[in-house]
């Protein structure tokens, strides 16, 4: 019997030797941008390195890439993926006079302007905003948030095509270059700024594995990014960040053209009421799960660990519940970029993920996914779903996938097997981006192909079992489900086998 209630009643709460299936993404900043710390982060559980292009020079980001790759030479382990997070079409205030902070009392009336002459001359009477069309899209009565909602202003009057008269709704300080949010207002900013385009080209040149695309509002935004990446960057995965109401409204069309999704709850919690973020998170994750596309939950997950060695209980619950919702990956931002306890943060996230994964009722979840998936499915998906069912029926401890593109591993992951999924591929890029898929453990097979395709297949399967033994996934006597193609190339995975490790029936 495997119901959710039965699973929770019998939940093992003490630490064990479980295999963590949820990937961990860590933002690399000044505190962690060195080889020794990156090695320590990887040993603690880091799978994907994130570079935040809202900050830092190209020289700095190049050093992150170089150090990440050096860490793999020092500590080979599992392959490490590198993600480039774009700045995106943000709205920001200008520079304050003498770059000082100005106190703003409640009910304080002032001017917001798009006049460039105030771009470096802001104070508590007039504030520059770099979105030229703000006076065209906003109306009196609307609210403007500044500095992640620290300050709120009500629009009193659209004075002219460059000027808004506003009133503060709370007290606070206004600083230079702070973010501006317009909740409930459709903005018409371009999907990519010139800086974003240059950043993407930098990513292509340096062989990053995925783009975290900020403030995506429409499917066309994703297509625009793909155009900039071009032929040379065609294998880079585009993970869209949903962080405004437009992105939520257009989510279905966005999901169709994206490789994956990040639920970026920071700006989203400003754009829509915070209690609604809970529902949006669950809804978007469920849609990604059904589509078989990876989904990341991000922002303020272990925020207090930026300064404290231990998290709050609420933060641990947040991480765990994101995993129970169905997130493939969870992400750390300031905790690893500038925090005092980056290793602790990754360790805490890894330990929390293991406990949360124990609470999942795998067979009811599998049944939900099978029943809700439109039929007919592709041959590869049919085999992937059957392999997950076979795990339960055979008591198998591992699913072993041979894949060139990683698509088969993605589809196996969709159906959430209780056991690990070992992916064996000759393509290093496939191995690295496959960290995005829940439960997938990628390994690169570096030997040249044998002339005999059958012998080559056997060698790769044998390598996968050896890696699984080395990592403690299986031992002699365990059943293994393997998926492979009937011939070489991409898109031919249609064969499932059951083997016993070290037994008479083992033929791999």
Curated annotation (Swiss-Prot):
What EC identifiers does the entry list? 2.7.1.40
Q: Which residues bind ATP?
A: 52-55, 92, 178
Asked if Metal-binding is a keyword of the record, the answer is yes
The protein's site described by Transition state stabilizer is found at: 241
Question: One MF term in GO for this entry?
Answer: ATP binding
Which cofactors is this protein said to need?
Mg(2+); K(+)
Task: Quote the Pfam families the UniProt record gives.
Answer: PK, PK_C
What residues bind Mg(2+), as annotated?
243, 267
The record lists K(+) as bound by: 52, 54, 85-86
Residue positions annotated to bind substrate are: 50, 266-267, 299
The family classification in the record reads:
Belongs to the pyruvate kinase family.
Subunit (UniProt)? Homotetramer.
- This protein is called Pyruvate kinase 2
This protein's species is Candida glabrata (strain ATCC 2001 / BCRC 20586 / JCM 3761 / NBRC 0622 / NRRL Y-65 / CBS 138)
Q: Which gene encodes it?
A: PYK2
